[in-house]
Amino acid sequence: MPQLDKFTYFSQFFWLCLFFFTFYIFICNDGDGVLGISRILKLRNQLLSHRGKTIQSKDPNSLEDLLRKGFSTGVSYMYASLFEVSQWCKAVDLLGKRRKITLISCFGEISGSRGMERNILYNISKSSPSNTGRWITCRNCRNDIMLIHAVHGQGSIK
């Protein structure tokens, strides 16, 4: 674009103003322009922040319910995986007995799975909402479950 000089100043200024005012009107219209989208986003952020405050203001029992559901889901997944391992170990053990070779000692899982389930359910019931240190109890519960895994691999659980 050439520099503004005395002869082309008016035409360049005219086209510049026409272009930018058209662009400005397109941006600032009340319909679907960019500012309309920004207003929608501002309203959405206000609603989300308001919703977040209402979620945080609920009683802590709902957090306990979420925690219990999470633990029960974890226990059910763990029990399902133990059941599948049990089936696999039985199949491999049958093949080993048939060939007179013991391939796997089943990791002590047949005797340990029931005791493991009992200990997990006991630890979950121990972390009740009436406990004042519920997060410490859950942390202890997680450590107990890890300890159960270590014992489970070595033999039976008493």
UniProtKB/Swiss-Prot annotation:
Phenotype when changing residue 124 to L: In Ogura, male-sterile line
Transmembrane stretches, start-end: 7-27
Gene Ontology MF annotations: ATP binding
Locations listed in the record: Mitochondrion membrane
InterPro entries for the chain: YMF19, YMF19-like, YMF19-like_N
Cellular compartments per GO CC: mitochondrial membrane; proton-transporting ATP synthase complex
Annotated signal sequence range: none
Primary location group: mitochondrion
Alphabetic keyword roster: ATP synthesis, ATP-binding, CF(0), Hydrogen ion transport, Ion transport, Membrane, Mitochondrion, Nucleotide-binding, Translocase, Transmembrane, Transmembrane helix, Transport
Protein topology in the membrane: Single-pass membrane protein
Enzyme class: translocase
Highest rank taxon of the organism: Eukaryota
Pfam families per UniProt: YMF19, YMF19_C
EC number, UniProt record: 7.1.2.2
GO biological process: ATP biosynthetic process; proton transmembrane transport
Catalytic activity of the protein: ATP + H2O + 4 H(+)(in) = ADP + phosphate + 5 H(+)(out)
Oligomeric and partner information: F-type ATPases have 2 components, CF(1) - the catalytic core - and CF(0) - the membrane proton channel. CF(1) has five subunits: alpha(3), beta(3), gamma(1), delta(1), epsilon(1). CF(0) has three main subunits: a, b and c.
Annotated family: Belongs to the ATPase protein YMF19 family.
PANTHER family on file: ATP SYNTHASE PROTEIN YMF19
Function statement: This is one of the chains of the nonenzymatic component (CF(0) subunit) of the mitochondrial ATPase complex.
Protein name in UniProt: Putative ATP synthase protein YMF19
Naturally occurring in which organism (per UniProt): Raphanus sativus
